[in-house]
Amino acid sequence: MFTTEYDVIVVGAGHAGAEAAAAAANMGAKTLLITMNLQHIAQMSCNPAVGGIAKGQIVREIDAMGGYMGIITDKTAIQFKMLNQSKGPAMWSPRAQSDRMRFSEAWRLQLESLPTLDFFQGMVNDLLIEKHKVVGVRTSLGISIKAKSVVLTNGTFLNGVMHIGLKQFGGGRAGEPAAHGLTECLVQQGFEAGRMKTGTPPRVDARSLDFSKMIPQPGDEHPQKFSFSAVTQPLQVQKDCYMTYTSERVHNILRTGFDRSPMFQGIIHGVGPRYCPSIEDKINRFADKDRHQIFVEPEGWHTIEMYVNGFSTSLPEEVQYAALSQVAGFEKVKFLRPGYAIEYDYFPPTQLKHTLETKLIEHLYFAGQINGTTGYEEAAAQGLMAGINAVLKIREREPLILKRDQAYIGVLIDDLITKGTEEPYRMFTSRAEYRTLLRQDNADSRLTPIGYEIGTVSEERYRAWEAKEQRVDDFITYIKELSVTPEEVNPILEKYDSSPMKQGDKLQKVLTRPSVTLSDFEQLPKVSHYIAEHDLSQEEKTCAEVAIKYAGYIEKEKNNADKLNRLESVRIPENFDYDKIVSLSFEGREKLKKIRPITLSQASRISGVSPADISVLVIYMGR
């Protein structure tokens, strides 16, 4: 049936698998995407939204490197918001509500347009391994398929078990079976496996809700978009979300089900996401709070289905219904399906290299929830990098490892490989020590040249980026050289209670004042004429403004990153013998032997490795 050998086989077609397959195919590799249901490619199993704090930056980075998540989100969005705009630009995070069904359909059509990508529906339950190297996969039907590299992106399907109250049943998500055999195969090869848990809220009928009792949550007045490319445009029409609250009455009803909660009764052993707790966990942990927010999100343009964000639960369905019907606006609620929790296997990511290749089996890569992460965006980022590195290894090219000062993707992977995770990992801006460098507005400046060099970014896309960079640079130069008078500027400064100018100065200097923005000066003819003449987009104006206004902070962070990169450049041999350095602490030695860091910088971030241990290594490596 399969007589030829593929370059790359991707197992699983969720957000990680879709990006992995697309990246490999765009690099010209003969790729096969295997999934249990071809109708559910890139399914939004949980909330119908992409982006958010730190996650939006990741989506922009994926897009900058030629991935598709940003484009698909733009094409299927029903609402867009730029979060945290009251804070500095390092915190600005794009987020979009998506049409769930259209999102999956758009992904499938995008993948089907790639000529070197094949598809097959089936369950992979075994790997073909020869001399510690993967050479293919075997399906549950006994079909063997050969490949030079394999990327596993199994999501929540590995031995998945779903829980609603004291009922439990096998499955990877609602209506789909679990995947069996692969965990056992990997454990037999020496991998360590663990269990994690996640959950999802009920879906309800919009026609049964009273939105007049809720608080509308509209999108931005002037929505932006995720993709840097010209193939998508900002939304012209948007759909509202809504906000309401639980109450003490709701909490009391939920408490009546605690004796049948699989979480509280010890039936669920997997660790759940700390930053996305179930509603029962919230009212148990925060008993002093008399209400919690609930966001009611439409699942698409033309569906009655609504997602009840903030009400994830695995309590019995009758308790879910009784409690939710006491929420303002939900008095006559009709359920489409109850919420549930799901437990699944994962593999601690310290078993991987920074390329996402496993340390035990060559040419085998893991990406997504199999590595202990949570979130579509985190999964997609890993899929992109695994797909890229799988192809680079086949071609005997240098691997692509993004550093912590280059991308949130670099922070994500470094955290996983260096620190591991014992609970579902999600990205936050606080995890990135160089977040002023890793802004959403400059993701293309940071990563598009890299994508072009490795083959995931097209020539057309790269040339468009070059032209944009030139326009931004020219505008920055213009602002730096443009003189303004007190008569032009003081009326603007007065609005912000900023001290008036006494003599003429450069616009650049005025723009660095707090509260003052570039849009304030667009009323000046010499600024507005330049913008109109060069047809500058809002994004280009923002890039220029941020570069000028925060130049000092950006320069300081670059200097700090340069210092770290000196340690990053000191490589540690792959088979380095830590036992011969007697000065290392016992814990430090054990952690170094387990993680096997590739640089001194990575070694310094391992929990349990002390500054004294690093000093010893610095001296030893300097010999």
Task: Place the predicted regions along the sequence by residue.
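Beta1/beta-strand and adjacent pyrophosphate-binding region of the FAD-binding site
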Residues: 2-16
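Core beta-strand elements of the Rossmann-like FAD/NAD(P) dinucleotide-binding domain
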Residues: 4-6, 140-149
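Short hydrophobic core segments
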Residues: 11, 144-155
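Conserved N-terminal/central alpha/beta ligand/cofactor-binding core
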Residues: 22-126, 141, 153-173, 177-183, ...
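An anion/pyrophosphate-binding glycine-rich loop and adjacent beta-alpha core
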Residues: 37, 55, 183-321, 329, ...
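Conserved beta-strand-loop-beta-strand element in the redox core of flavoprotein oxidoreductases
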Residues: 128-144
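A glycine-rich dinucleotide-binding beta-alpha-beta segment and adjacent secondary-structure elements
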Residues: 307-373, 401-414, 537-591, 596
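Extended, charge-enriched "interface" segments that sit outside catalytic cores
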Residues: 431, 437, 448-615, 619-623
